[in-house]
Amino acid sequence: MVMADTIATGDKTSQFDGKHMQDLERIYSTRDTLDDNFFGERGQKDANGDYYDELNNEETNYSGSSYYGHSDDSEVVGLIKNDTVSQLPPLDSFIFPDSRALFLLDLGNYADLTYEEIIVHGFEIYIVEQWVACRNLSTLITSYTGNSQDTISGVRVVLPKDTSMWPGRFRLYFEELMEFARPKFTPKGTLFITNLSGVSFGLNLLHVECGDLRTIWKDFEVNFDLKNLHCGGRSANLLCPPTMASLDKFSQLFKIPTNGFIAQYPQMIQQQQPRLPEEEYKTVGNSKCRNTDSKSPVVEMVTLIQISLSYFNLLSKNYQTDGLLCEDTKRAIDEWWETYGKLYLGTEKPRNECTLGPTTVAGLISLILCCYFKLMIENCISSKDPFDEAGFFQGIYNFQKKHGLNKRKSRVYLDPRTLEKLFEVTAKVSSKDIFKLKKMVTSTVQDIIGKGNPINLSHKILTTDLDTLIHNIHGGSVGLLWKGKGHPRKCCTDISNEEFLKFNYQRGDPDGQIREREMLLEKFRLERIAYAQKHASKKVSSSSLDTSEDIGRTNAMPSSATVSSMFPNYDNTKYAYNFGINKLYQGEYYRRNSFPYCKDRTHDNIYEDLSELKEKSSRLYRCNSSSAVQNIVEKWDLPFDPSVVRIARDLLRMKYDIQAQQHIQEMDEHYMGKLNKEGTVGQYSKFNERYKRLQELYKKYSDGAKVFEGRFEDIDNKQQLLLHEMQELNSLSSRLKYDMRILEVRVRDIESSVAQFDSKLIGLKSSLQGQGKTGICSAIDPKSDKDEYDRCVNDLMTTNNPTYEALCLKMLSRRYFKDLKNDTVGWFRWLFGNNSLHNNASEDDRGIRV
C-alpha cells in the first residue's frame, strides 16, 4: 500500500508479454522452491548465450494483462483487469549491482521505495572504463556465470512490474540499461545481464573480483586519474591499490610531497597489505575499517581544477566536481586555454604535456588566485578560501553588481567582460595604497597567503611555473595540498561522488511490501468477480429486452465510453460492472435522429430561428426558485444512482447547443447588415473592391516588412560583429596597457642598473689611480688632443716592460706586422732561393699598401 500514492495510474502497455495467470503462479511457485540446483540446471543453457529464453518460455506478465487467470473474451474480467492495474499495479523486485548509479538517481529521496542490500550468487560485474570517462549513469555490466562461488553485491528495489510506471529518472536508467542488457529472473528478483560475447571490443572491461563496487572505487578513482595524468600504468591495474612508482611520478611532476600525503592518507599505500577474502566482502559496505572520509591528493588536485573551471562556466550546471578526470573536464580545459589562457598567460598550451599538465595546473590555479586577490582589493569577497564555491561566486556577483555587469545573465561566473573589468580597475592600485590596505581584513590575508599583501600577489602570482605558484601560496585548500598548511575547503555546494560509499542501502521490508500488495490485489479480484457474477447476469437479462430494439436502430459507431466515466468514483466495486446500464447509455447517446427526439427537447434549437436564439439565451426563465438551493439544503446520501438516459440526453443537448453557438459566432464575424432588393449588388461590389484593395495593401506592406526584416538582420549581424571586434580591441588595449606598465617598470630598473654600473666604474677608476697605475689610468682617460694621444701610444709601445695594454697595442701596430713579414720572407729566401716568392711577396706588399 505504500506505493499506491505515488505511482502513476492508467492502463499501460508493458514491454514484457504474457498469457495467463497460471504461468505467473507457476513461476512464483518455482521461485519459492528453487534450491542450489537452480544454477546447475540452467548454467549450461545460459552459458551458450540463451539468456532470455525464459521470457518466451514462461511468458511472465509485467503489465498485469490477464493477471487474474480469465480469458480476454470475458468483458467482466477485462474491466476488472483495467481498473485493478490502474489503481494498484503489481510490484516486483529488481536487483541493481551499480550502487553508484542508484545513489546518483537520488534513491534516498523516494520516500515510498523500499530496498535492501543482498548477495547474489552466479554472477560477475565489470566496470567499463570508457563509460566512466564519459560519465554515463550506468558504468557496470553484469554477466551470468552459473558458478555459485561467483557472488556480487546488489541493491534490491521494489518497483512496479510495468516499467513505464517507474519514477522518471528510474525510467531513463531502465532505457539506458536496455541498450546493452536484458532482464533475467532469479529467485531474489529481476537482474539485468549482458552477454559478454556481444560487447564491443573497443571497451575496456575491468573485472571486479570482490563483486562490490564500493570496495574498489577509491583505488579505481585514484588510478584512473593517474593514468589520465600520464603517471599510471596499464588499465588492468586500475582496480589495484596505486603503486609507489605512480605516486612518486605524480609527486615529482606536480611538486606534491610524497611523505606528506602518505602520512595523511595511509590507506592508499597498500602494497604490503593483502586483499580481503571474498567471504569478507559481504560486510564491506558497513565496514568501519576503511576511512572513506579521507581524499587522495590526486583526486583533490583534479577537484580543484574542476572547481576552477566551474568559475568560468565551462562545466555544466549539474556537473559534479568529484575529482574524476573525465572527458568533459578535458574538453573544458582545452576551451579554457583558447578563451582565457592565451590572453592572460601570454603563452600557448604546451604540446609536450598531457591535457592536465603542470603548466595547466599552475596557470589555471594562479589565475583563480589572481582574481581572488583582485576581488579582495575591490572589497567584494569575504571568503577565506578561493575554492569555497559559494563565497567565490558571491564575490563575483558583488563585483558585477558594483560595476553593472550582471544585467542579462542568469548565472554568475567569470566571463571575459568581468575579467577585463577586474584587471582594469585593479591595475592602477599600488602596494603603497594605504587606503586599500585598511579595507582588507588582516586575518583573511594571513589565512590565505600568510606573508605578503594581496596587492603585490595579485600581480606576481599569475604564472605558468608551478614552483613560483607554490612559493606564493601559504594557506587555504591549495596550501593544504602542496605544503600541508591550511584548512580543508568547504564542499557543501556539491554532492561528493564518494558519498555512495557511506550510503545505507536499507529501507523497509521489500518482501513484506510485495506480499501485502499481492494479498490486496487478490482480495480485490475475488470481491469484484463475486460482485460481477451476482449482478451482471441480472442486469443483462433485464435490459436485453428493452434495449434490443433501440440497439437495432443505433448507428454502428465505435466508442471508448466506460461506466467509470459516468459515475463518481465513490465505490468502484459497486458500479464497475453495470453492463446493462452501460448499454442503455450508449444506445441513448448514439441514437440516430428520429421523430421521438422532438419529444425529449434534445433538438429544440434546430427548429428555432438562429437570429432569435441569441436573444432567447439572455432571457430569465425563473428566479428565486427553491430548486436552486435544494442541493445545499437537502443532503444527498451517497452513493446514489444517476439516470443514464438523462445523462445521455443532457450530453446531446450540450453538444448541439455548442454547435449552435459556434454557428452564431461565425455569423456575427461576417455579418454585414440586412440587404434589400435594391442595394444588394452595389453593396457587394463595393465590398469586393475594398476587399481587393485591402489584399493589395496587405501584400505590399508584407513585402516591405520582409525587406525591412532582411535589412534588420543584416544590420544586427554587423552590429554583433562590431561589438565583438570592440570587445577584442578593449581586451587588447587592456593587455597593452598592462604590458606598457610592466615595460615602464623594467625600463626604470634598467636605468637604475646603468647608474649603479657608472658609479662602480668611477669607484674602480679612483681606486686604480690611488694604487699608482698610471698606464691604465692614462688608457682610461679620454684624450682630446691628437698629438697627446700619439705620444701616449708611442710611450706604451716603446716601454721596455709593457703591460697588457701596451702589448696589445704593439701587436696591433702596422710596423710590427711589417717587420714580421720581412723576417718571414727572408727565411723563405734563404731556404728556397726562389725569386717567385720574392715577386709574390712584392705583390702582397703592394696589396697591403693599397
From Swiss-Prot:
Stored InterPro entries: Stb2/Stb6
Residue numbers bearing the Phosphoserine modification: S594, S625
GO cellular component: Sin3-type complex
Keyword Phosphoprotein belongs to the record: yes
Domain of life from the UniProt record: Eukaryota
UniProt entry keywords in alphabetical sequence: Phosphoprotein
The keyword Lipid metabolism is assigned to this record: no
Family: To yeast STB6.
Subunit structure: Interacts with SIN3.
Protein's recorded name: Protein STB2
Native source organism of the sequence: Saccharomyces cerevisiae (strain ATCC 204508 / S288c)
